[in-house]
């Protein structure tokens, strides 16, 4: 077993884009997670002051800095949780796993690697985001049983060209296609998700592509005050859903408090923890 998360990550980078569905990706993802958790186990933790209702956060302490915020109620530090989930995923059989447990396992997988990078690499914002893309992209591909594409053909009178996209999964004739943006967080950039969905609807027809973004969290840490907040734009989201395009689901690993409330108002946005995906797949594609 590798003790170097970044070494396993480097191997993952080399093969991922060629075959997102490949089972070896999950093996390498597991190596990244186990090595990160092993390193973090020996790190001190500091409690952060949470300004988010009913949530508590801590950070891992490195030699010169501390990591991003970690949700105490979601974090699982035993790597066996990932190993057990990986076995279930290989069979696409999730008996014995609750929605909450799957969400916690995947949250812990993502946040552990991100925290490792936070305290060991200076100013590296790209690696955590790319790893999260690999993690969610592979899980989605395996659950759906198909590899994604990142370009789609666009035909018009004057030319034939392709449209660059987030991951798009085509399940075959007369079945829906999934449009999968993957983000560590969204902030004000979230309008890009709705805009991209609008383009897909305009080119291919409304309802052909199911917009299902997956997002890690919306937390922001004030390192000086050691405070955690969630940065959310619920009113803007409602406007985007009414006037730009319709997203089928918005999945989070750490569901923001104000976005969770959007399930209860008009226009309803289906904001759910990511564990739901593994149990509602059939209803989404039916």
Name what the model sees in each region:
Residues 1-138, 143-144:
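Interdomain/boundary linker segments immediately adjacent to catalytic/signaling cores
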Residues 143-161, 170:
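A short acidic/basic microdomain associated with nuclease active sites
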Residues 151, 201, 284-285:
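Intrinsically disordered, low-complexity Ser/Thr/Pro/Gly-rich regulatory segments
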Residues 154, 171-173, 183-186:
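Short, flexible loop/turn elements at secondary-structure junctions
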Residues 168-178:
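Active-site beta-strand-loop-beta-strand hairpin of nuclease catalytic cores
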Residues 181-235:
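Catalytic cores of nucleic-acid endonucleases
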Residues 216-286:
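Domain-level recognition of nuclease-like catalytic cores that cleave nucleotide substrates
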């Amino acid at each position: 077993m590798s003790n170097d998360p970044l070494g396993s990550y480097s191997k993952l980078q080399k093969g991922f884009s060629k075959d997102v569905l490949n089972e070896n990706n999950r093996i390498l993802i597991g190596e990244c997670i186990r090595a990160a958790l092993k390193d973090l186990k020996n790190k001190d933790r500091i409690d952060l002051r949470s300004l988010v209702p009913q949530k508590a956060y801590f950070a891992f302490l490195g030699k010169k800095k501390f990591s991003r915020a970690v949700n105490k109620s979601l974090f699982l530090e035993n790597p066996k949780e990932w190993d057990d989930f990986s076995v279930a995923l290989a069979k696409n059989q999730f008996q014995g796993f609750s929605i909450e447990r799957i969400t916690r396992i995947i949250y812990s997988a993502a946040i552990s690697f991100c925290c490792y990078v936070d305290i060991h690499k200076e100013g590296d914002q790209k690696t955590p985001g790319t790893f999260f893309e690999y993690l969610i992209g592979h899980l989605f591909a395996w659950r759906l049983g198909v590899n994604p594409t990142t370009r789609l053909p666009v035909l018009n009178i004057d030319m034939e060209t392709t449209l660059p996209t987030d991951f798009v999964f085509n399940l075959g004739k007369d079945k829906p296609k999934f449009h999968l943006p993957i983000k560590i967080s969204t902030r004000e950039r979230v309008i890009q998700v709705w805009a991209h969905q609008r383009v897909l609807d305009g080119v291919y027809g409304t309802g052909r592509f199911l917009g299902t973004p997956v997002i890690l969290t919306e937390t922001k840490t004030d390192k000086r005050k050691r405070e955690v907040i969630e940065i959310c734009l619920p009113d803007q989201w409602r406007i985007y859903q009414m006037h730009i395009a319709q997203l089928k689901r918005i999945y989070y690993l750490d569901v923001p408090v104000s976005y969770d409330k959007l399930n209860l108002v008009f226009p309803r946005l289906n904001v759910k923890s990511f564990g739901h995906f593994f149990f509602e797949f059939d209803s989404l594609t039916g």
